[in-house]
């Protein structure tokens, strides 16, 4: 993994021990501890940092087999929020220094990468992210208890809900964690897009004098350079680097301090301001507290906007890959204008066949991102009244889109774009034999002559170049000058015809 949000497919297997309730005597009593919730007592593995709420969530949501720990930036974001909350509550005199410092120490360990394997709830879950929030509360509480010299589960000294979750609700913690994690992932994606853009820019410079035929609707149009074609790809990608930066700013508005529905119940009047300040200091992000916390708690518009931009990126890069596959088609019976690097054998039955597998895999990532956008759209629309209960699938979809598209950009540049070569003679022959060349000659030989040349070239298969010379419409030197890439591919002053 190169960095950023990890792809979900890196998980091979995910199993969490599930123990029965305490109604009978356990054979593993020395290896478990008992925890209690409103549904009763449960045995928890003695060495587990998660607790009863997490255990029930694992049992209730065996959906994907992918734990939330697959997204380390989400886990770090949760720890950052709990740390900021503890600092704020201590500053407000609501949390004593001893327990507050222990919570902060536990959060810093998690942000450094420790205990991520204890975040075991499934990425898709009911409850608007409550299972994820409680998983974080329990892990932090039990590690803080250890720091204080107590055993795991000894919640009389420090409680997951009362101290770790103080002044908070899942309904402000979860969306804020999603925004923090996604923000960092988006900038990793932007970095990868810049790598791909620069790859196309290098090829544009390499191919700046290579003349070729442009095509509209797959038919010959007018000449251009291969450099112009590749430069366009770089511009397309660069535009969306900016769009992603704009979308990233939208997700910097958070609803911490909203608690349950945005009214701020069970929190101090100064808490929302303080927790945002501490989060800015911890994350380095330009976070701001939403003006209307009730609106911010129920509205998923920023996620919809970001997902839409990710779809835009996917559509553009997929279109570029379509072009690369088409331009390299053949090699004997296709366009064969460019060569893509051969990276693996292409067929189990056709010897010597090589396929454009890198553009193909990027196409598939784009299809996935487009599908993820539809999922985000439906999930955002399905919110009801003061809360959207479907943010877990929004999170999973956004994380996949950001992560997979990032890897796709890096792979496309490294294993395809950097090694592309031009079939220069083939490209030149296409230009010289194309009837579309008459469009470039029209200002010099006139529309009627250009039409006559086009009709004869089509009927006889002869080149426009040869027919113009044969008919004496232009001297060879003039024709050669007109066919220079600088003349054919840019606006020029027109010759005045007698």
Name every feature range the model reports, one short phrase each.
Residues 1-22:
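C-terminal lid/capping helical subdomain adjacent to the catalytic/cofactor pocket in oxidative enzymes
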Residues 24-498:
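Conserved, well-structured ligand/cofactor-binding cores
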């Amino acid at each position: 993994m190169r960095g950023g949000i990890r792809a979900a497919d890196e998980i091979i297997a995910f199993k969490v021990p599930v123990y029965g309730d305490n109604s009978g005597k356990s054979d593993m009593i020395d290896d478990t501890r008992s925890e209690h919730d409103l549904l009763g007592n449960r045995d928890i593995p003695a060495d587990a940092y998660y607790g009863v709420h997490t255990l029930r969530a694992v049992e209730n949501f065996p959906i994907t087999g992918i734990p939330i720990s697959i997204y380390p930036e989400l886990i770090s974001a949760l720890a950052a929020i709990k740390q900021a909350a503890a600092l704020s509550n201590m500053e407000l005199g609501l949390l004593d220094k001893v327990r507050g410092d222990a919570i902060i120490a536990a959060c810093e360990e998690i942000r450094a990468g420790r205990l991520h394997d204890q975040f075991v709830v499934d990425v898709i879950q009911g409850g608007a992210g409550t299972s994820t929030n409680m998983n974080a509360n329990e892990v932090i509480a039990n590690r803080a208890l250890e720091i204080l010299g107590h055993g795991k589960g000894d919640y009389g000294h420090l409680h997951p809900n009362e101290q770790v979750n103080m002044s908070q609700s899942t309904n402000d913690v979860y969306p804020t964690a999603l925004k923090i994690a996604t923000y960092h992932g988006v900038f990793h994606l932007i970095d990868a897009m810049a790598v791909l853009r620069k790859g196309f820019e290098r090829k544009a410079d390499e191919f700046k004098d290579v003349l070729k035929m442009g095509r509209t609707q797959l038919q010959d149009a007018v000449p251009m350079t291969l450099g112009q074609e590749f430069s366009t790809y770089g511009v397309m990608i660069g535009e969306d680097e900016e769009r992603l930066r704009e979308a990233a700013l939208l997700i910097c508005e958070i609803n911490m301090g909203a608690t349950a529905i945005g009214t701020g119940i069970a929190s101090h009047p100064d808490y929302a301001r303080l927790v945002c300040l501490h989060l800015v200091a911890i994350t380095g992000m330009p976070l701001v507290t939403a003006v209307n916390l009730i609106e911010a708690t129920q509205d998923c518009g920023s996620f919809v906007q970001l997902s839409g931009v990710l779809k835009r990126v996917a559509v553009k890069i997929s279109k570029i890959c379509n072009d690369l596959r088409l331009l390299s088609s053949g090699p004997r019976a296709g366009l064969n204008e460019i060569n893509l690097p051969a990276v693996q054998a292409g067929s189990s039955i056709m010897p010597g066949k090589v396929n454009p597998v890198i553009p193909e895999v990027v196409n598939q990532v784009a299809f996935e991102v487009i599908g993820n956008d539809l999922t985000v759209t439906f999930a955002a629309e399905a919110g009801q009244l003061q809360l959207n209960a479907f943010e877990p699938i929004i999170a999973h979809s956004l994380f996949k889109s950001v992560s997979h598209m990032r890897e796709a950009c890096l792979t496309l540049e490294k294993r395809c774009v950097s090694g592309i070569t031009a079939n220069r003679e083939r490209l030149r022959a296409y230009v010289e034999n194309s009837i579309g060349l008459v469009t470039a000659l029209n200002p010099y030989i006139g529309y009627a002559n250009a039409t006559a040349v086009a009709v004869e070239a089509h009927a006889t298969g002869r080149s426009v170049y040869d027919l113009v010379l044969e008919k004496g419409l232009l001297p060879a030197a003039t024709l050669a000058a007109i066919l220079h890439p600088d003349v054919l591919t840019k606006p020029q002053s027109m010759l005045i015809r007698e």
